[in-house]
Amino acid sequence: MAVGTTTGELRELSDDELTDKLRESKEELFNLRFQMATGQLANNRRLRVVRQEIARVYTVLRERELGLAAGPGGEDS
């Protein structure tokens, strides 16, 4: 997942694409935690950024679930 993905950009994605981004971000977080445990992590800030991206994806999915935001193209998913 690219650094700096905004909530607005995430809102333009379909539910399937959001699920894929969530899976990718969780995999990246797992790998970063593993690197930290083995002392190979050079950029500690990346952990925080990835956690924030995961939270943004969950936020967009929850908005759609509650009907607070429409899916891409203005239609509910």
UniProtKB/Swiss-Prot annotation:
Key words of the record: Ribonucleoprotein, Ribosomal protein
Disulfide bond residue pairs: none
One Pfam family from the record: Ribosomal_L29
Gene Ontology terms describing biological process: translation
Lineage: superkingdom: Bacteria
GO cellular component: cytosolic large ribosomal subunit
One MF annotation (Gene Ontology) recorded for this entry: structural constituent of ribosome
Signal peptide range in chain numbering: none
CDD domains: Ribosomal_L29_HIP (cd00427)
Similarity section: Belongs to the universal ribosomal protein uL29 family.
NCBIfam families found in the cross-reference section: L29
Name the record gives this protein: Large ribosomal subunit protein uL29
Originating organism: Mycolicibacterium gilvum (strain PYR-GCK) (Mycobacterium gilvum (strain PYR-GCK))
